[in-house]
C-alpha cells in the first residue's frame, strides 16, 4: 500500500456511505447504490505533484458522469503553518518515485474533517432506500 492508498483508506475506510470500495494509487472507487458509483481522487490544482484537493465524481454506471466537484483541502481545514514556507494551503507532495507525504502538518482530526465533508457531499446522492437501511 502506497502513501496515497493509505491516506484514502484511513479517511474513507469503514464508512457507511461508500460500499465495496476499491483503492488504487490516488483513487478510490465505490458503490453508492445499484446505479451510482463514486470516484474520489487526490488531484493537483496548481503545481504538479502537489495534491491539494480531492476530486469527487458521481457516476451513473450506464450514463456516465452525474456530478463532479473538487474540494481544496485549504477550504476544508484552513491554511497551515510550516517552518519553511510560512502559511500555506495543505497538500500532499510526491517528491519522487514512491516518496510522498503531507508537506504541511495535517492532524487526524483534520483528516476526519476532510472525510466528513466529502462524505456529507457524497451522501446527497445515496438513494433513500440505501440510507434508510443503514
Identify the function of each model-found stretch:
Residues 12-21:
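N-terminal segment of the mature soluble domain
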Residues 1-7, 23-134:
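Intrinsically disordered, low-complexity regulatory regions enriched in serine/threonine/proline
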Amino acid at each position: 500500500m502506497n502513501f496515497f492508498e493509505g491516506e484514502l483508506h484511513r479517511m474513507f475506510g469503514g464508512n457507511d456511505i461508500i460500499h465495496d470500495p476499491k483503492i488504487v494509487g490516488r483513487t478510490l472507487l465505490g458503490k453508492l447504490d445499484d446505479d451510482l458509483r463514486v470516484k474520489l481522487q487526490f488531484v493537483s490544482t496548481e503545481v504538479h505533484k502537489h495534491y491539494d484537493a480531492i476530486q469527487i465524481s458521481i457516476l451513473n454506471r450506464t450514463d456516465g458522469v452525474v456530478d463532479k466537484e473538487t474540494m481544496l483541502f485549504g477550504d476544508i481545514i484552513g491554511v497551515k503553518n510550516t517552518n519553511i514556507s510560512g502559511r500555506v494551503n495543505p497538500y500532499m507532495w510526491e517528491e519522487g518515485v514512491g516518496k510522498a507525504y503531507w508537506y504541511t502538518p495535517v492532524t487526524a482530526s483534520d483528516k476526519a474533517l476532510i472525510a466528513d465533508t466529502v462524505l456529507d457531499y457524497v451522501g446527497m446522492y445515496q438513494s433513500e432506500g440505501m440510507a434508510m437501511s443503514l
